[in-house]
């Protein structure tokens, strides 16, 4: 790839910067959980006894493993997405919104189930699973921050898609006439899938 293929102005886009923030949040979320190799009081009394006096690691908990997998996957996605912004190869706004929506649901499930597990009590009613597990608690917090930032990205992308009359979702074509505020040509109405050249730097009030 030559230097001329890269658009340096992409980093000025609020959407690009939001993705960069999410990249750091997701990296921190999975790294702190992956480093939690002891001090978890669970997932059950038998397993805790096997782990010994220092407690269990995150790998003994299915929900914590799920959190790590989702955050690693989203971190890799954000790295790829930032690269696509820089080379101006981002998919249509409709496609981008749907991808964000899928990750939004997965991250919400990951951090909410992990938070619930973290507050479970196995041995003592006053001693939750994550009482001494600062890494796990930090991981869940950063997963939540990732989700909140992703919600903002979805809002920006939704507004962008709305401004394009909901065109550009490859699976359905142009279905703007079925969406609020749309006035396009229906399911096969000839809407294009190319995004305007100024989308990467567009801001919204």
Swiss-Prot record:
Please indicate if the UniProt record lists Nucleus as a keyword.
Answer: no
In which domain of life is the source organism classified?
Eukaryota
Which residues lie toward the Extracellular compartment?
A: 88-90, 159-167
The residues covered by the MARVEL domain are: 10-162
Gene Ontology cellular component terms for the protein in this record: plasma membrane
TM regions (residue ranges): 67-87, 91-111, 138-158, 168-188
The UniProt entry lists membrane topology as: Multi-pass membrane protein
Q: Which UniProt keywords apply?
A: Cell membrane, Membrane, Transmembrane, Transmembrane helix
Which stretches of this protein does UniProt put in the Cytoplasmic compartment?
A: 1-66, 112-137, 189-205
First and last residue of the signal peptide = none
The keyword Cell membrane appears for this protein:
yes
- Subcellular location(s) of the protein: Cell membrane
Predominant location: membrane
Q: Which family does it belong to?
A: Belongs to the Casparian strip membrane proteins (CASP) family.
- How does this polypeptide assemble, per the annotation? Homodimer and heterodimers.
Q: What is this protein called?
A: CASP-like protein 0U1
Organism of provenance:
Micromonas pusilla (strain CCMP1545) (Picoplanktonic green alga)
């Amino acid at each position: 790839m030559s230097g001329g293929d890269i658009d340096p102005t992409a980093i000025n886009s609020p959407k690009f910067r939001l993705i960069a923030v999410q990249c750091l949040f997701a990296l921190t979320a999975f790294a702190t959980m992956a480093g939690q190799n002891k001090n978890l009081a669970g997932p059950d009394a038998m397993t805790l006894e096997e782990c010994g006096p220092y407690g269990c690691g995150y790998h003994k908990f299915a929900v914590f493993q799920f959190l790590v997998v989702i955050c690693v996957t989203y971190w890799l996605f954000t790295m790829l997405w930032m690269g696509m912004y820089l080379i101006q190869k981002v998919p249509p706004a409709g496609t981008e919104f749907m991808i964000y929506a899928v990750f939004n649901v997965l991250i919400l499930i990951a951090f909410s189930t992990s938070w619930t597990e973290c507050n479970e009590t196995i041995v003592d009613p006053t001693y939750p699973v994550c009482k001494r597990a600062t890494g796990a608690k930090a991981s869940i917090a950063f997963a939540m921050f990732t989700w909140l930032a992703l919600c903002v990205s979805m809002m920006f992308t939704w507004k962008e898609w709305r401004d394009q009359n909901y065109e550009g979702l490859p699976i359905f074509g142009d279905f703007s006439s079925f969406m609020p505020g749309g006035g396009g040509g229906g399911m096969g109405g000839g809407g294009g899938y190319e995004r305007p050249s100024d989308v990467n730097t567009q801001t919204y009030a």
